[in-house]
Structures are given as C-alpha cells and as structure tokens.
Amino acid sequence: MANALTRNDTVSLEFKADDPDGDRVTARYQWLANDNPVDGQTSATLSLAAVRRGERVSAELTPVDGRGAVGPAFRTEAVEVVNTPPVVTRVGIEPATAKPGDVLRATFEGSDMDGDPVKYLFEWWRNGNSLGTPSKDQEQRTLATDGFTRGDMIVVGVTPYDAGGPGRFLVSEPFLLLNRAPVITSSPKGPMGQGLFEYTVTASDPDNDPLTYKLDTAPSGMTIESNTGKVSWQMPAGFSSPQQVRISVDDGNQGQAFQEFTLTPPPAR
C-alpha cells in the first residue's frame, strides 16, 4: 500500500505463498482500522470510504491450502488515512442568458468527504484572459460585466479548500454574452403645417451596431429613410380617420426596438 491514503482511494492486496505439499493456496482477508476489524471488509480490496481520516489501515491475511489447513496469519504494515481534499462536481453560470452590463453568478456543487468546512475560490476569465485571482477569503461568486461587449466568452473556475488544502479545480462551460437591443429615444409630434407630417426617429444601440429603420404599419404614402429614420407623410385631403403607425429599428444582430403611435386628423375648422 502507499505511504499515505485518502478516503477517495481503494486499496487491494496481492500475496505470494508456498505450500510444502504443493497445494494451491488461497487467503482469508480481514481489513483493520487502528488494529480493529472493519465490519464486512473481508475481500482483497477495501474502499477507504469505509474508514475515517486519521485511522491507520492494515490487513490481515490468513493462508489456507486446498486441504483446509490454515497457516499463520500475516499482517501488512499500517498506513494512515490522511485528509481527503474537497471536491467540486459541477460549475455553471447564471442566468441562462445575459448581455453586457448584466451581473453573472457562479453556480456549483461541492462536498467534503471528511465533513470539513469548505471555502470556495472563484476565478473568472474573459476571452481566455484571467480577470484576477482573488485570495481564499474573497469568494468572488459574482461578476459585473459593465464595459464588456457582445460576443465576449466568459468562464468561471472554482477551487475548493478545506483546512488541509485545496481540492481539484473545475471550470464551467464557456458562456457567451449576447446582443443588446437598440433603444428608441424619441417621440413623435403631431402633423405640421400644410398637412405635412415629419418625424425623425432617433435610437441608440449599446453595442454600436448600425441601425436600419422600417415602417411595419403605416398609412398609404408614408415613407421612412432606412438609414436615418426620417418619416414623411403628406396627409391626403380626405384625412378623416386615425392612422396607426408602427416603426421597427433593427441592429442586424437579432436586436429590435419598436414604436407605435396614432396620427389623428386635425380639428375641423
């Protein structure tokens, strides 16, 4: 057996024996913890989950020949079961989708086989570059993405620590920051003189994408400049009923904003 073992380990025994009569020799096994038999552990292998940290594990082998004759027992040298490092079994990022400016949070599952208190160290990466390694006392489970951009790839890694030291580091699947939709910042005014309605839609895009303006619903004859958002409509002489207008702004990356309003006829004179 190794010089030091943890409760994650499984140990096994091999033996060589001679019989004066040339009979085949088998062995009876008994595993021991601090020289006391471990209940039910009488095979050639032992999962150390069956014992506790700090116990010294050994095994006693008793040779038996094919005629049932029993030889003297042999005991292995005892080996101490040392601290079993904590483990992290799953790491993820929430929410399920996010955009630049959102706050991300690491999710994880972890445990310590010895029942020790565990601290977790979180480290974040953006496009393969570390965003800094916090100390053991700084559990930076969240990440603010202000200043990040669409398409940034985010990863978080988690290292568990107990009093005996760190466990194995585990990282999440890459997490992609998504596109942000444009925002319309203007409001239309009523018809202008001589029955002419003009309105320039203004919009901004957080990702600085070029924007395309479109009329989804509009009265006959109304136009919009796709690159500037300027809306023009010469009201017909018979304009007497309300007209619905719906404008869409598209950033070319599946981000859209919409504005709806109603144009009403001017008061009769």
Residue ranges of predicted features:
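Ser/Thr/Pro/Gly-rich low-complexity disordered regions
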Residues: M1-R269
